Amino acid sequence: MTLRAVGVRLLGGLLLFALLAAGAAPLGWDLPESRSRASKIRVHPRGNLWATGHFMGKKSLEPPSPSLLGTAPHTSLRDQTPQLSHHLLRVLLQKQALGMSLSVPAPNTQHRRLLVQTLQK
């Protein structure tokens, strides 16, 4: 074979390869949208707010029931007076049984008084 025949065959092979590659290319490539179509999308500066309220939970105008909160209903100080008196008497009897003085305050009472004053402000 002459040099010219080899060149023609090589050129023919390259052309055939290019045609096959060009024919298969649109099937295998996932090309992005053209720039003209992509530029038409509006961008909102505050972002997409479609699900803002969806994740915020149920809104209710009524206060939650005590059974749902796991706490007892609100009771006044007058309702609690007998229980508090009973508890105070029990603490005083325990202090007396342990030999502690009832007139001397406990060491942390000063801190407790400061905390109570701060909370009342």
From Swiss-Prot:
The record's annotation in InterPro entries points to: Bombesin
Instruction: Mention any Pfam family matching this sequence.
Output: Bombesin
The propeptide segment or segments lie at 60-121
The secretion signal range is 1-24
Look up and give the organism this protein is from. Answer: Bos taurus (Bovine)
Q: Which GO terms describe its cellular component?
A: extracellular space; neuron projection
Key words, A-Z: Amidation, Cell projection, Cleavage on pair of basic residues, Immunity, Innate immunity, Secreted, Signal
Protein name, UniProt field: Neuromedin-B
Residues that the record marks as modified (Methionine amide) are: 56
- Any idea what job this protein has? Stimulates smooth muscle contraction. Induces sighing by acting directly on the pre-Botzinger complex, a cluster of several thousand neurons in the ventrolateral medulla responsible for inspiration during respiratory activity. Contributes to the induction of sneezing following exposure to chemical irritants or allergens which causes release of NMB by nasal sensory neurons and activation of NMBR-expressing neurons in the sneeze-evoking region of the brainstem. These in turn activate neurons of the caudal ventral respiratory group, giving rise to the sneezing response.
Q: Which GO terms describe its molecular function?
A: neuromedin B receptor binding; neuropeptide hormone activity
- Keyword Signal recorded: yes
Keyword match Signal? yes
Family statement drawn from the similarity comment of this UniProt entry? Belongs to the bombesin/neuromedin-B/ranatensin family.
A GO BP entry is: positive regulation of interferon-alpha production
Q: Which domain of life is it from?
A: Eukaryota
- Cellular location of this protein? Secreted; Cell projection, Neuron projection
Q: Where is this region: Disordered?
A: 61-80
